């Protein structure tokens, strides 16, 4: 008996159904065991419900890119994870270049003059509503900045629209959102070095805050901290 494939004949030998079933069962058990040991996905892998990209082909900055990014979020609303409550999803956001001119104007209102672009970083931070826990988180962030030899330039309260439709559960968990501005220290000569320092600062502060076992410490989160981009 033979079967033609791409013009070539290969012999086919019949195999009993019982043998095939037994072999498949063994393979399945081995696969399940392997998955139980290491998990279904590699630890370094991350997934997103929906992702879109907008860029200027010549690298020029434009507010239209942000507008188009917001339009993408609306267009992929069906890809967002939503539970029984349609007003409670798993979150969404934009990753953009640091808007230097905007931040420069905003921080000038506090009397803070930002260094040139690339010589400062911005951390977007979710903080607990409870005052004592929030202050403890901010203090640990400031300690981490100082310990790494960098400069605390100041904090900025991020304005939010609380009139947006929101479920009671989401409103209860809504964080205080602040941005921390960090200037480069004397030991930092290039943006790549500052980017690495910001990574260390974020990890150091987060680890310390976790170890404090604050009443509302789980509400602390840093979506981004960089001298190039912000979420």
Feature-to-residue mapping (PLM):
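N-terminal segments that mediate ammonia production and transfer
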Residues: 2-231
């Amino acid at each position: 008996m033979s079967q033609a494939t791409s013009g070539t004949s290969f012999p086919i030998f019949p195999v009993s159904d019982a043998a095939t079933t037994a072999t498949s069962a063994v393979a399945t058990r081995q696969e399940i065991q392997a998955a139980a040991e290491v998990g279904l996905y590699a630890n370094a892998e991350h997934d997103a419900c929906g992702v879109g990209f907008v860029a200027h082909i010549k690298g020029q900055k434009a507010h239209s890119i942000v507008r188009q990014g917001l339009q993408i979020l609306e267009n992929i609303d069906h890809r967002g994870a939503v539970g029984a409550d349609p007003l409670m999803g798993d979150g969404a956001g934009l990753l953009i270049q640091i808007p230097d001119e905007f931040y420069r104007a905003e921080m000038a209102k506090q009397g803070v003059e930002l260094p040139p672009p690339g010589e400062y970083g911005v951390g977007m931070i979710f903080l607990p509503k409870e005052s004592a826990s929030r202050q403890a988180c901010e203090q640990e962030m400031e300690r981490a900045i100082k310990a790494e030899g960098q400069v605390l330039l100041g904090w900025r309260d991020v304005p939010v629209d609380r009139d947006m439709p929101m479920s009671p559960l989401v409103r209860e968990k809504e964080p205080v959102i602040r941005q921390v501005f960090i200037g480069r220290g004397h030991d930092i000569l290039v943006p790549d070095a500052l980017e690495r320092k910001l990574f260390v600062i974020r990890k150091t502060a987060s680890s310390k805050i976790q170890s404090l076992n604050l009443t509302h410490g789980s509400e602390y989160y840093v979506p981004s901290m960089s001298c190039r981009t912000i979420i």
